[in-house]
Amino acid sequence: MTTETIDGVRLTTKANVYFDGKCVSHSFALPDGTKKSVGVVLPATLTFGTAAAEIMECVGGSCEYRLDGSDEWKQSGPGERFQVPANSKFDIRVTEAYHYICHYA
């Protein structure tokens, strides 16, 4: 199931812009203080580092991702999620706009 709306959030209005605009996101917090971000990755191959563990949820488009230490690219599409450990990194390869929610652990 793909998340289409998130009610009752506190949104940071200034965008987080990475990789010369290839990734743009907005951070928000749920009423219980849980932090997340929602954004889009435009066509590119990028490497992201993580401080906290992350769960990437695809809400539109698709991507291929490769976790740190792996040679295997895996596909992720709408309604699918993948997990990235804390203090790690992952590669993401996008050929069409990839819309996501990042759930921080």
From Swiss-Prot:
It comes from the Bacteria. It holds the Pfam family Ppnp. It catalyses: a purine D-ribonucleoside + phosphate = a purine nucleobase + alpha-D-ribose 1-phosphate; adenosine + phosphate = alpha-D-ribose 1-phosphate + adenine; cytidine + phosphate = cytosine + alpha-D-ribose 1-phosphate; guanosine + phosphate = alpha-D-ribose 1-phosphate + guanine. InterPro entries: Ppnp, RmlC-like_jellyroll, RmlC_Cupin_sf. One of its GO terms (molecular function) is guanosine phosphorylase activity. Transmembrane segments: none annotated. One of its GO terms (cellular component) is cytosol. Keywords: Glycosyltransferase, Transferase. Signal peptide: none annotated. Its EC number is 2.4.2.1, 2.4.2.2. The keyword Glycosyltransferase applies. The keyword Membrane does not apply. PANTHER family: PYRIMIDINE/PURINE NUCLEOSIDE PHOSPHORYLASE, PYRIMIDINE_PURINE NUCLEOSIDE PHOSPHORYLASE. Belongs to the nucleoside phosphorylase PpnP family. Catalyzes the phosphorolysis of diverse nucleosides, yielding D-ribose 1-phosphate and the respective free bases. Can use uridine, adenosine, guanosine, cytidine, thymidine, inosine and xanthosine as substrates. Also catalyzes the reverse reactions. This is Pyrimidine/purine nucleoside phosphorylase. It comes from Ralstonia nicotianae (strain ATCC BAA-1114 / GMI1000) (Ralstonia solanacearum).
